[in-house]
Amino acid sequence: MRAGRATGPVHPSTPLIIMKLDDLYSELTLKTKSKLVLLVLDGLGDIAVGGADATTPLEAARTPNLDALAVTGAQGRLLPVAPGITPGSGPGHLGLFGYDPLEFQVGRGVIEALGLGLELKPGDVAARANFCTMDAKGVVTDRRAGRIDTSICEELCGLLRQKVTSVGDAEVLIQPGKGHRFVVVFRGQGLEGPLTDADPHREGLPIPRSEPVVAGSAKAAKAAGLVEAFYKAALPVLSGKLPANGFLMRGIAHQPDIPTFEVRYQLRAACVAVYPMYKGLAQLVGMSKLEGSQTLTEQFERYLDAHDAYDYFFIHYKNTDMYGEDGNFEAKKKAIEELDAALPVLLKKRPDVLAITGDHSTPCPMKGHSWHPQPVLLVSEFAGSDRFPRFTEATSNQGSLGIQEAKFLMRLMQANARMFDKFGA
């Protein structure tokens, strides 16, 4: 008989304890004086198409400051949700914050509403909206209404607020965002989400009717009826307001319960972002919002100003994603170079743990989010050095971090901050 581990019956009085992984991390967590920074270049990852000489914007960019960090850090790839799944920005960021995006699902409307400073109440249903252009038959011809200026968005939202104050028995709240974006909140009794998007997601199609995602929910059915009523009331108000004579709504949902960042990680956290959605994501998990910055340099200066007040900073940079969605290789490359040029400001107070990554990939050839794992660079005294001279998709493929689920990046940052006690004897 082959030798092996001795086995025997479990004594009836011996309880079998199965610990959830999050509970284990919580049990092992120690307080820290370290400073942790997550720098997100939205949609950073890309793909090289066209043979051996093909490259990506990150590979083509001149990035001396990122290169200097790469020499001292560890690289790898992050899988935002699961193989083959293309994430939205919400799941992508929640994963980076260490929240399983399959367990904690949040509608984009909720995120945008919080980011714009709206206080959501129990029973509120929020939708992210953007103005669009429609032809005479109601077919969407431009999903972003020519990227109208924020001032025009504010003017149109003001008009809608005057003309459509309620639908059914629900109050309607309308808040303008940046550019063509705005938020609609339905405030009433007996409402819930999620609902399907009133958005065809491409030009050449009419706006679809919003329906409950979960069949049989009376509260969601009522909310869907309010969305339909809002369209009937609001579209006539926009008639003739080209290029913004229509609007799309998506991420229609109510606010879920999510444990706060400080409770989960014992870290005081702050967010430095420009766009409302990312402020909303941060607020959703209890981060403070450091307002007042518009440029990268200003964002990094806000970090310097607040350095001593917080343990963890989430800093968000949008342009890489925006140009990826436009399919503009050169502009995305330039956006990466602009980030690199501003990095010395951040490094005036170099964090103990610095993670640089994206929330997902936005390849220029695809002009949209994709399922490709995004590159990640982790720099700390204890991360170890892969000794690569650059930070790119190609070097990330060879890095010591390998391919990790994005939800574990936060735990790796904690480990590098020496925040975990030893597990077991």
Where are these regions (language model features)?
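Basic polycationic patches enriched in arginine
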Residues: 2-5
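Feature captures the catalytic ectodomains and active-site-proximal regions of enzymes
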Residues: 8-11, 15-425
